[in-house]
Amino acid sequence: MFLSRLVILFLFFEVAFYPSVLGQVKPNVLMIAVDDLRPALGCYGDQTAITPNIDRWAKRGIVLERAYCQQAVCCPSRLSMLTGLRPDTIRVWDLNTHFREAKPNAVTLPQYFKNTGYQSRSIGKILHGGGAPSKDPESWSSPPMYDNVRDPKLRYALQKNLNGKGLKRAASESAEVSDDHYIDGIVANESIRVLGELAANKNPFFLAVGFRKPHLPFNAPKKYWDLYEKEEIQIPKHGSHPVNSPDWATRSWSELEGYTDIPVDGKITKAKARELRHGYYACVSYIDELVGRLIAELERLKLEDNTIVLLYGDHGFH
C-alpha cells in the first residue's frame, strides 16, 4: 500500500525477527496501532521527541521510512491496511461506512490469522473508534474490548473539563494523575492481562492493541508534559493560508475547532500553537511508556523471541 503522492501520514513498522521466529510456522503477532502518530519519534530523527522505549526496540527491528497511507482519515486508512484494499475498492472514505457493505467477502489481517488457527484478539481502537465500522465479528475470536469509549471520565481528569458538555471539551490537558487514569492506560493494563492469558494457551495469537493518543484531545499525565520545556517547543514557521491554494485546503477543520478552547474562526495564537504541540509530544511520550510496558511483559513471559511486533500510526497530524 504505497502512494506516489504526498500524504499526511506516518507509518512506523517495527518487526523483530529472530532465528526461532523464522524457524517456526506460526509465530505470535503483536500489532500496536497508534492514532494520529506522525514520525515524532527519536528513531525517525525527531530531535524533540522523548521516546526511549520505541527507540530501543526500533534498533532491534526494521524501521520503514517510505510507508504511506491510502487516505489521511482514520477509518479508510486503517481498513485499507487491514484488508489490503484501496479505499475506493472498499468504498470507505469517511468514519461511518462499514467496508463489508461493498466487500462482504473481504478477509482482514486478523481474520486471516483467525482462519489459520490463531487466537485473534482486539483491545482498544483498531478498526475504528466507534459505531458500525469498529465492529467486525469475522475478524476476532472474541468481542473487541474498549473499541468504543465515550465516557468523559476516561478522556479527561481536570474537574473543569469533567464539568463540560459534549465529547469535545478542552483540546489539551495536563493533570496530576497516574497513567491508568486515561483510557490508554486501561488499554495497556488489559493488554498485559490478555498477553498472560494468551501465553498460557498452546495456540499462537494475533493481538491487536490500539492506543488513542496522540489523537486530540492532547491529554496526558503531567509528568509527560514535564519532560519538555515549553519554551523550546517549535511552532510552525508559516501559519497563514498558502498562496493560490483553495479555501477548503485549510478551512474548515472541525476536528480541532470543535474543542471549547479553540477559536471557531481557526485563528490559533502562537501561544496556543505551542501548547498544542507541547501536548502532542506529551501524548507521544505517554504512549511510548505504555508501549514499553507491553514489550516488557513480552520479555517477562519469554515471548519476545517468538513474537513479531508491528507498530504503526494510521496517519499523521499536521
Task: Give the role of each language-model region.
Residues V7-F17:
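Bacterial N-terminal signal peptides
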Residues F2-S4, V21-H318:
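Formylglycine-dependent sulfatase
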